Amino acid sequence: MKHLAREIVQVDIEKELKSSYLDYAMSVIVGRALPDVRDGLKPVHRRILFAMHVLSNYWNKAYKKSARVVGDVIGKYHPHGDSAVYDSIVRMAQNFSLRYMLIDGQGNFGSIDGDAAAAMRYTEVRMSKISQELLADLEKNTVEFIPNYDGTEHIPEILPSKIPNLLINGSSGIAVGMATNIPPHNLNEVIDGCLAYIKDDNITLRELIQHIPGPDFPTAGIINGKKGIEEAYRTGKGKIYIRARNKIEKNKKNKKESIIFYEIPYQVNKSRLIEKIAELVKEKRIDGITALRDESDKDGMRIVVEIKKEAMSEIILNQLYSLTQLQISFGINMVALCQGQPKTLSLKEILKHFLSHREEIVTRRSIFELDKTCKRSHILEGLSIALININCIIDLIKKAKSSLEAKELIIKKTWIYKNSEKINQKDHDYHFTEEQVQAILDLRLHKLTSLEKNKLVLEYDCLTKKIKELKKILKSRDRMREVIRDELVSIKNNFGDQRRTEITENNPDISIEDLINQEDVVVTLSHSGYVKYQPLSDYNAQKRGGKGKSAAKIKEEDFIESLVVTNTHDTILCFSSRGILYWMKVYQLPESSRHAKGRPIVNLLPLSNKERITAILPIHEFKDNLNIFMATAQGIVKKSSLKEFKKPRIAGIIAINLRANDELIGVSLTNGKNNIMLFTQNGKVVQFLENSVRTMGRTASGVRGIKISKNDKVVSLIVPYKKESILIATNNGYGKRTKITDFPIKSRATQGVISIKITKKNGKIIGAIQVVEKDQIMMITNAGTLVRIRASEIGVLKRNTQGVILIRTSKNEKVVALQRIVEPI
């Protein structure tokens, strides 16, 4: 052992790591992960097919055990684990993995459900018919052979490949620092593209796409949109969307609809897909599905999704596409080896490299065949002369003492012959070559019959024509391209089939809003921070003084604090107690029943400790001419442009810098010309002009809006309109309507006037809203009881009155929220 390291070389570890890793990376790139652009195969696939070729494991021969093939591959050509080789064989035999299978398998080779193949000792394989086109002309010196890993065998550096395998079967692999993901295509279309390129190598991409419109996956499906295809074909990189194919079936008995999926996207595991759908239904992320079954059999795929009678199949379908692998994005990255170097290729470049490869193969094949044909023609020429002079030749052979002497006598003699026009000589003198003499000496006696003589002449004539044709192919590129074209047409006729994947013009980008049904909803936020929305249609209008319906199941110490009526597609601006604004879509909130309490908003927004949402504002559209007007409990107001809040951030943005112990109580949209009304819990109100407050930046603190007493605070912010009245409600369930004209316009920062007479009976103000006759209002108590009342049923009273009963509350029950509903039901 002491003699193993006789010399130690000191090297810099950084340089050694760099050099060694680079060697490893190139080994993976060239020798394992990336296909060659010429035959579309990685080394392992090429070695598998060559090993089967050596074994004569052809499509028209008997199957051989997979283990036999694996053993030959790893023993002779591929010094890696048997599982890596067998996994490659399995994939080459799966009709859902390769568009055109290269191996014909017998036995269990796995399934689209992700089931593993049987062990290689149980399965049998042979080459498929099309795979032999990859190896055609291999024995005609068409490709170079290189030593195997130990130098005991030789393997082809590349396969001759008559088929454009890189495109028709695609390829995927991850190397070091790069990856490839080439989708499969239809053979007919790819060959049509090749023929068009042969006809005009200056063909444009747009013209080429007329022949090759896009990928064609073995699992069919639908490709949505052509933009990604064109981008990938032009640059080598792009993204396409593959969608499952479905149909809607209606049950004749119960009239319920079912969505039937009978084609799924490429490389999607069907079993996991069904599990995901079931999980989404269980989590109630998809509502409306009543049953889910896999009815797939030997005749085809069939995934059945039964939906509720009242559910809309289009919405559920879009939700399934968005949330599951029923629609996937396929990233195209056409990287392949070109002359041993990885390169990102366009569609046109791939065709160019393949056809250049075919030209090289046809050239080498023609040279090989020409040499072989010329040698045979030379022999036939000698035999023809010998048959003319057969008697003389026989005499020489008889006189010779040995075969060597006979050969020398025949070579030295000058021969005279007739029919010279069939022999390429200028005169009648002829001298045999050594090869010709050997053929003459090997000639059997039965060849001397007249019939055999005619056969030799006919064969010679055929060879002469073949030599002429081969020389023409080698001299003329046009003729060579004709040969390539004819071979491609033959491949198309023998193996071409119909396209499976449909390509549509539809926009593949499914926005979440496309999946959500537009409907008016009630959004509630409890004092403890539980938020939810539920359809507005869940509530019917009641008479004044009714007991109401339960709007939320809440804990005894919790109560509903905020309630807004909005639409599922609107934006909710959530203003926190710290003056931070958070941006959400209504549909991002949890949808719950009336009896559910919803979800904690802290799970939806990144709120910090002791931070809570104090105001929510629904926004339908962010318009530049609108403002956000804010009011705090201490009477501070601030106006900022709505466009300041257009771009959300995950962590939120500053809406207002609050003073100590202050918080937001109201937010409203204004146009710069409105009036502003601030109502306090002790029954005060001030109305002033909006233009008395200048527009400020998001981080400003604001200005004084109303002067308040020590034990008072602002509870409502209203932007009034001329035709509306103000409805004021108290925590004991009292309320009234008062005309807006009864509230005088004062200067900003004054104490204001009386809005409602506060007594022990009616309690303090919990809120004020503006209403018209056709409006309805909602009131909610801290016990979770909700009542819906028509505004027209509430009397119009003067400012200095205490109001009438709007909702009857039980002991310790207080009204905590008030909201207007614009459109009555």
UniProtKB/Swiss-Prot annotation:
Stored NCBIfam families: gyrA, PRK05560.1, PRK05561.1
Location in or out of the cell: Cytoplasm
Keywords, comma-separated and alphabetical: ATP-binding, Cytoplasm, DNA-binding, Isomerase, Nucleotide-binding, Topoisomerase
Species annotation: Buchnera aphidicola subsp. Schizaphis graminum (strain Sg)
GO BP terms, alphabetized: DNA topological change; DNA-templated DNA replication
Pfam families tied to this protein: DNA_gyraseA_C, DNA_topoisoIV
Protein's UniProt keywords contain Protein transport: no
Catalytic activity: ATP-dependent breakage, passage and rejoining of double-stranded DNA
Molecular function as annotated in GO: ATP binding; DNA binding; DNA negative supercoiling activity
Extent of motif GyrA-box: 542-548
Active site: 122 (o-(5'-phospho-dna)-tyrosine intermediate)
Family of this protein: Belongs to the type II topoisomerase GyrA/ParC subunit family.
Main location (coarse class): cytoplasm
Miscellaneous note of the record: Few gyrases are as efficient as E.coli at forming negative supercoils. Not all organisms have 2 type II topoisomerases; in organisms with a single type II topoisomerase this enzyme also has to decatenate newly replicated chromosomes.
UniProt keyword Flavoprotein, yes or no: no
The organism's taxonomic lineage, starting at the top: Bacteria, Pseudomonadati, Pseudomonadota, Gammaproteobacteria, Enterobacterales
Top-level division of the source organism's lineage: Bacteria
Biological role stated in the UniProt entry: A type II topoisomerase that negatively supercoils closed circular double-stranded (ds) DNA in an ATP-dependent manner to modulate DNA topology and maintain chromosomes in an underwound state. Negative supercoiling favors strand separation, and DNA replication, transcription, recombination and repair, all of which involve strand separation. Also able to catalyze the interconversion of other topological isomers of dsDNA rings, including catenanes and knotted rings. Type II topoisomerases break and join 2 DNA strands simultaneously in an ATP-dependent manner.
InterPro entries: GyrA, GyrA/parC_rep, Gyrase/topoIV_suA_C, Topo_IIA-like_dom_sf, Topo_IIA_A/C_ab, Topo_IIA_A_a_sf, Topo_IIA_dom_A, Type_II_DNA_Topoisomerases
CDD domains for this protein: TOP4c (cd00187)
Protein name according to UniProt: DNA gyrase subunit A
PANTHER family per record: DNA GYRASE SUBUNIT A, CHLOROPLASTIC_MITOCHONDRIAL (PTHR43493:SF5), DNA GYRASE/TOPOISOMERASE SUBUNIT A (PTHR43493)
EC nos: 5.6.2.2
Subunit structure: Heterotetramer, composed of two GyrA and two GyrB chains. In the heterotetramer, GyrA contains the active site tyrosine that forms a transient covalent intermediate with DNA, while GyrB binds cofactors and catalyzes ATP hydrolysis.
